[in-house]
Amino acid sequence: MKFNPWHDVSIGDNAPGVVKGIIEIPKNVRAKYELDKESGMLILDRVLFASINYPANYGFIPRTYCDDDDPLDILVISQIDIVPMCLVEANVIGVMRMIDGDEMDDKIIAVATNDMSFNHVKDISDLPAHWLIE
């Protein structure tokens, strides 16, 4: 039997306020990795331009779908770079409504529950202004 992180990992018992996310891309990395839907492994999609990187750890929420037939994306804010394929519990603080092509491609904004430096953040408005600009 083959294990697939998208289909075989729980979203968490406290969803939608607290969810589990699987990190694909650590923050400040210029590589765009994606989960291969069939194998469950990460593939290198592309390398981003030198001035572009991810301001937060980027991944997906298991057992979810967005309009683009991919799992729902999540940006997990933490003071550390979280390694790819790490399962992270995160407090949801907001959503970035996005359209890719003609399809909804929302990004859930969350903070890692086990990162004490972000325990005070309960809503996206609690983030420092400089983070929102990034």
Regions found by a protein language model. Give the residues of each.
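Hydrophobic N-terminal alpha-helices or hydrophobic patches in metabolic proteins across all domains
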Residues: 1-134
